[in-house]
Amino acid sequence: LFDMKDDYDGTTSVDKAALVYNSENYGILGNSLAICHYLVDILKPETILEAFNAITGSSLTSADLLKAGMRDWTLKRGFNNLLGITAKDDKLPKKLLTALEDGGAAGSVPDVKLLLSEYYALRGLDERGFPKEEVLDELGLTELKARLYQ
């Protein structure tokens, strides 16, 4: 459902943006459905979808669930944009940009430029860090679009 890898190499920046994107969408759903944070980490998305449909009598698909997570994240991002948050604020702390001297991640430093480029493409963000108009249309966030692009 969320295309999460089991064998992810944490020392590389390759595919990390997709991992973050999927983790955020999934985690947001857990928050929205009031599922214990610890359970979200161990339950498969398919299990949550099946339980949601059984409890509510709905017949949501995995695509519906993914879109709900995307919509929730985009709404929060747009709200933060309205409060002044932009691409300039999307940065990692200096400590995370310094290579460790030993351990499993020794020598690895995230390629922030690559990560942000891939992440912005996945999220449908423009160079300012705002959701693109077509993304807002696709997610039905017309009021947010009107406020961001007035």
Name each region found by the language model.
Residues 1-150:
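Extended C-terminal regions of large enzymes
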